[in-house]
C-alpha cells in the first residue's frame, strides 16, 4: 500500500476519532438486510434530529475508538457495523429512539451496544432509554403538570361565578 493511501486512511481515522471524542451518545448497530431506500430514510431521520451515521471498516473503528479513549466497544465492531452518534448534549435519547423505531419496524437491525456520556451501555439499557420521551416531550409534560392547579382553580372560580349569576337571576 502506498504511503499516500496510508496517510489518507490515518486522516480518516483521526477525523472520526475527533467526532467520537465529542459525541455524547454512541450506538453501534448491525444494519445488514436493510435496503438502500431504508438506510437512506433512516439516515434522513437521524440527520433531521442532529444525529450522524457512519459506516466504516471495523479496523478503522477500533483505531478511532482507541484514539478517542473509548474502551469497551471493541466486541461490537464485528460484522456489518454502523456507528450512530450525536454531540447534542440536550437530547442524548434521540439516537436510541430513532434506532429503536427502525429496529421495531425492520427485524434485520440489531443494536449491538453503545456509550452514553462516557458510560458503556447495553442493548437493553438503550431500549429503555428509547422509551423515555425527548427533551421537548418532558418539558411539555412538566408544563402540563405545572398548569393543572392553575387551570383547576380557574375552573372553580368560573363555576362559582356562574352559580352566583344563576342565583342572582332567580
UniProtKB/Swiss-Prot annotation:
GO cellular component: large ribosomal subunit
UniProt-listed CDD domains: Ribosomal_L10
Cited PANTHER family: 39S RIBOSOMAL PROTEIN L10, MITOCHONDRIAL (PTHR11560)
Described purpose of this protein according to its UniProt entry: Forms part of the ribosomal stalk, playing a central role in the interaction of the ribosome with GTP-bound translation factors.
PROSITE patterns: RIBOSOMAL_L10
Family as reported in the entry's similarity comment: Belongs to the universal ribosomal protein uL10 family.
One of the Pfam families matching this protein, by short name: Ribosomal_L10
Keywords: Ribonucleoprotein, Ribosomal protein, RNA-binding, rRNA-binding
Name by which UniProt lists this protein: Large ribosomal subunit protein uL10
Alphabetical list of NCBIfam families matching this protein: PRK00099.1-1
Assembly and interaction partners: Part of the ribosomal stalk of the 50S ribosomal subunit. The N-terminus interacts with L11 and the large rRNA to form the base of the stalk. The C-terminus forms an elongated spine to which L12 dimers bind in a sequential fashion forming a multimeric L10(L12)X complex.
